[in-house]
């Protein structure tokens, strides 16, 4: 299944999906040394974002979040790509300075992709591709 998208930060990546319906504040929600979601109130608490295609509505919080994304990349703990419904400046700047593909303007149905399903993000071509068989692509 191919999904059209808008490029925010260039690049191409493939990885398992990690999906949340909640916004993410990289300063406070994510440990920059481990890539683990550390906010017990967040839907992804206890999960690692490292190497994942992180799918979330958008970012929130402090502008320091951009530098947390950069720290994650430098430590090898960053997501392989990010998909937002609507990107905002904090996540956009973090992705750009870190070289992490970031796309947005996707349908809300992307939030139905099951965690663990293999997803390809080709920001330069404006395509998100769900690579798993049709029988297990979207959750109910």
Regions from the PLM with identified roles:
Residues 135-140:
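Short, charged/polar, Gly/Pro-enriched secondary-structure boundary elements
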Residues 2-13, 18-129, 134:
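Feature captures the catalytic cores and cofactor-binding loops of soluble hydro-lyases/lyases
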